[in-house]
Amino acid sequence: DIDTNRNMKKIASLLMGTVCVSGSFLALAACSSPYEVASMDRSRLVVDARYDARPDAEAMAFIAPYQREVDSLMFPVVGETTHQMATGRPESDLSNLLADIMVWAGTDFGEQPQLGVYNMGGIRANLPAGKVTKGDILNVAPFENKICFLTLTGEDLLLLFREIAHRGGEGVSHGVELTITKDGQLIAARLHGQEIDPQGRYRIATLDYVAQGNDQLSAFKRKTDVHEPGGKENDSRFVIERYFQEKASKGEQVDARREGRIVIQ
């Protein structure tokens, strides 16, 4: 009836008003708000190590119980390195190590990848020389990226190598040999001493973020036969931890070197 329609219109009007008031700037604009930004100002507050010299006693007392819990999680040693490892293009000891770990982890998930790829942008810290803690691993791989496995044709793998060349290098596993130019062109590509067969199929271990075609590695969007293992153990930092722990159980230190996987000519 008429009264019902009027009530419904009132309710709808109230709802629209609520959206306008509580929505984002886009919602406000859509509702033709009369308000406009008259001026804007900003300032920069640098929060860095300078504050460590004079810690606030009250704040330190407040976080103390939480700090103990964090330390208990971050300080356990998982292994040792032979030297400090850092990242850098076109290749580095740390990026080589992480790409190799991707391949190494394949057996944990019933996979036999022929190569591994680890994006430089996902490496956020260096590894120290000597003892390495869980916290060190978290600093290197702070994101919840997960290992995954996929297949590319040889033609698409060559496209991937061209994209890696264009970016000046990414983390690639042992057996990959790329020759690139200073301006990011791919000159030659080999895998385990063999030319890439355009008609072949190649199994690759990488991170899910990379497999989605991010970091300008769009060749991964052509992937097939994707295997994304579930579970917490699939997080990249836990995969890295297990590698260190296995080495430690054998009394071995973790070592990685630059070996000419990506050469600029």
Q: How would you name each of these model-derived features?
A:
Residues 1-5:
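Intrinsic-disorder-associated, low-complexity terminal segments enriched in Asp/Asn/His/Tyr and depleted
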Residues 6-20:
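Bacterial N-terminal signal peptides that target proteins for export
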Residues 27-30:
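C-terminal motif of bacterial Sec signal peptides marking the signal peptidase cleavage site
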Residues 33-48, 97-99, 103-105, 111-116, ...:
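Feature captures C-terminal
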Residues 40, 44-126:
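Hard-cation-handling environments
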